Structures are given as C-alpha cells and as structure tokens.
Amino acid sequence: MLIVKEITDKNTWEEFFEDIEDKTFLQSWNWGEFQKRMSNKIWRLGVFEGENLITLALVVKIQAKRGTFLLVQHGPTIKNSKFQIPNSKFQIFKVLLEELKKVGKNEGASFIRISPLLKDNEENRKILNELGFREAPMHANAYEATWKLDITPSEEELLSKMRKTTRYLIRKTKKDPTISIKKSESLEDLKIYEKLTQMVAKRQSFVPFSFEFIKNEFEVFLKDKKVLCFLGNYKDEPVAGALVIFWSGVGFYHQAASNEKYAKLSIPYQVLWTAIVEAKKRNCKWFDFWGYVDPFKYPNHPWAGPTLFKMGFGGEKKEYVKTQDYPLNFSYLKNWTIEKVRKKKRKI
C-alpha cells in the first residue's frame, strides 16, 4: 500500500538522493529553505511503500498575477528499486497526484505543474497523459533538457575529449598573466556578479533574477558550503562570472554572465573550467551545464549559442518529458493563454 507523508527531517530527505542519477538542487532541502525565504509556502512530500521511502516531491505554492498554482520543479523523484506493487510508476504518480489535488484545492490553486526528470519516451508520456496531465505552454523556469559531463576522469582526460578550440582557449587563458579567476563566498563579490547579470539582461532584453533571488539562493546554500561565486578578472576588472552549486555529487552551472566588451579574451572558458575542477575537488561525479537546446536544429533559439559553448567541454545531452500541467478549475485557461503568448514573444 502506498501512503503520502510530509518529510520533516533534512537528513532523510538528502540521503534519498544519494543514489539518484537524474536530479537537481531544485528538489534539495535547501531549495525548499530558499523558497521559504522568498515567501513561498512549501510542502515536502514523501511516498512510502510500507516503511520504504520511494518518492519525494518538493512542492511550492506560486502566487502570480496570472493565477495561483502548485509547482514541482524537476520532480517528483522516484527511487529506482524493486517495488512490490504492479504498474508502480503510474500508481506512485496517482497517489501523489491525489494529495496534490487536495493541497491545491485548499490553497486556491488553479492548476498543478510538474517537471519530473523522466526520460522523454512513450511509456512516461503515456503515464502522465492517462493521469490527466497535459503539456504546459512553457517550461517551469527550469530546463527540460540539459548537457552533462562525467567528471570522474582526470583533468588531462577531460581536456583531451573537449572540442579543440575549447581546449586551446582554456590553456591560453590559463597562461595569460592579465587574467585571473576568483572563487568567492563573499556577498560583495556576489554584488559584482549581479551587476554583470544586469548588463547581460539589458543587452539581450530579458528580465534577470533579482538581487534578492540571487542573494537568498547564495546564502541558503552557503550555510552548507555548497555554493561558490566565480569571477573572471582582466587586469583586476571583473568581466565574467558564474554561480555554481555543488549538491549531491553534482556541480551545477546554474547562472553565468559576462561583459561583451571583453568577449575576445574568452575568459568565460577559464571560469567554467575552474568550476569543473572545483567540482572534481569536491568529489562530484557529474557536472550539469544547466540547459540544452539542439543548436543545429534550433539555431535562432536564445539558448543555441550558450549550448554550443557548453558542448565544447565534452559531455552528453539528457532529454526529459516536457513540463506537465494538471488543471484544477477553469481559471487555468487564463494562465494557459498568457503563457502561450509569452512563449511566442520570447521565441522559445
């Protein structure tokens, strides 16, 4: 028999993810703490088969102008094990959905949005479809495909498998005495990084994360020493940066920005390589470059250029089922229409 309970112990939550391959920090305990800092209500739900914890879902209540909804980013996460129940994946999603529907109705939500890291195949799409989910008009502010690199080989092996140009630029910037990389846990350096993001946002005409968002994310993960701000300097001037999270054996290249004025110096290559080396030092097995789109199939997509840059470091693509919505009432239609228009405007 499957039952759903709230999880209140951090260690129980974090240990669950140790043997999970497809995971991101958007389902971590600390991300829940971050959401609370952002004044969002959360639920940490676990599905049990008897005494065994087999599924987790960090659920966040989002209150937006277009409507209120429940969000499960990069979850629910199902543990790979020998279940006693037939058709286990379907049954797990079903019992969890029933709990989410209760929460959603109590909170006045118009829909439930999930983006589980399940392989994008017919079996998984069928399960979600049969439960009443429908493909969302936009992704849940988190990727549906990413580029990942196994970083267990030596540094030299990793370099040897990179694109020739990428390897050359890493070595070139490493030797350049005018270029230096700083690894920081300082809020002052985070402010410098945030200025770079504002510069990129203005150049590319998009709304960046607020400093409150970046600061809260940084401080929450910093408590456990699981985040660093990387700054690439040219003659002591910060011209590139990245915010990297190290969680559950994975390094996440969550955010990055650079000053276009210094593009020819190729400093972002050294920033990213330094982050990968740091992830290795922290015994991470994988490095997640955070987001992927086929740059050859969709050359005009906003992520096409960044994806080409990431691919140069070696690795492989990981594609998951599309973000899914479960409507709870007719007001979902308003949200669907607004997001459909936004997607068209953003050309994504």
Set out the residue ranges of the language-model regions.
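A cross-family glycoside hydrolase active-site/sugar-binding cleft signature
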Residues: 73, 113-115, 254, 290
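A conserved beta-strand-loop-helix scaffold within acyl/acetyltransferase catalytic domains
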Residues: 5-50, 56-66, 116-121, 133-140, ...
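Glycine-/proline-rich flexible loop or hinge segments
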Residues: 67-80, 107-113
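Short, basic, low-complexity termini and linkers enriched in Ser/Thr/Gly/Pro
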Residues: 78-98, 128-129, 178-182
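Non-catalytic accessory segments adjacent to catalytic cores
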Residues: 93-146
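Short histidine/acidic/glycine/proline-rich micro-motifs that form metal-
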Residues: 77-78, 118-119, 293-297
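Aromatic (often tryptophan-rich) hydrophobic motifs at membrane interfaces
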Residues: 95-99, 103, 216-329
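Active-site/acyl-donor-binding loops of N-acyltransferases
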Residues: 6, 10, 20, 131-155, ...
